[in-house]
Amino acid sequence: MTVGVFAALGEEVARVRECLGGVGTERAGLTFYVVSVGALQVVYVCGGVGKVNAALCTQLLISEFGARVLINTGIAGALDERLCVFDVLVSVDAVQHDVDVTAFGYQKGRIPRMDSVEWTANTALRYLVREAFDLCTRDPEWTEGACALSGSGDPPSRVSRLVEGRVASGDLFVSDAQTRARIIREFGAHGVEMEGAAFAHVASVNGVPFVIIRCISDGAGAEQDVSMSYKEFSTRAARRSALLTLRVLERLSALRTSVVASLFPMVVV
């Protein structure tokens, strides 16, 4: 079985490359790294920021490399008050907060001719992420540099938290309270970033199970200076997301073929 891993930024995939290596293959000006992890073939790519780049990479992972399970790893801004810097958001579903065709009677976020606003993540993959997270929290590399979101009142040593919820994506970096409040009000999202929903859209229309893993890097406009928070925490948050992704790959590689077939019935193994 081939698992595709997409990240937007170099720091979001750096730890994966350190651990897995792989042979680079060029497609559309991007380098896709192919490597065996147990019985799995893993293909991972740093594809660039934004929804178009996410869609491009996701389709290439499916069409060119035969990915039958997809993981999007990276960082996000927190919209849920339970989430602090270095906590983890795992997608229940994903929406595009910058799509607006309401002038023609469509619900905010809904693309014409699509059945719904949201793209739903695979339940079995979410379970594997939760299992992997439990393992990560016992890893010294994971706990190094733990810190709560500035102003939250939580001590720097607080235990990392995993929250499952809605990921909202759009082609803008959310850094002001007004935009933040709008996304929460209109979509009930738990975190915001710039790629996940496009990744989820392409995975879904191809019938490929997916999950989005996001480590929180900032408060998406909740703090006084979001750019300062992002610059300070993004690299470490990205590393955590990559560590969690590696653990998920380990869990997937340990599954028997019969188990994979039962968990992902549409997957050819």
Swiss-Prot record:
**List of catalytic residues:** E12 (proton acceptor), D218 (proton donor)
Example GO biological process: nucleoside catabolic process
Q: What is this protein called?
A: 5'-methylthioadenosine/S-adenosylhomocysteine nucleosidase
Query: SUPFAM superfamilies, alphabetically?
Result: Purine and uridine phosphorylases (SSF53167)
Q: What is catalysed by this protein?
A: S-adenosyl-L-homocysteine + H2O = S-(5-deoxy-D-ribos-5-yl)-L-homocysteine + adenine; S-methyl-5'-thioadenosine + H2O = 5-(methylsulfanyl)-D-ribose + adenine; 5'-deoxyadenosine + H2O = 5-deoxy-D-ribose + adenine
Known EC number: 3.2.2.9
**Record-listed substrate binding positions:** G77, V174, M194, E195
InterPro entries listed in its UniProt record: MTA_SAH_Nsdase (IPR010049), Nucleoside_phosphorylase_d (IPR000845), Nucleoside_phosphorylase_sf (IPR035994)
User: Organism source for this protein?
Assistant: Treponema pallidum (strain Nichols)
Q: Where are the transmembrane segments?
A: none
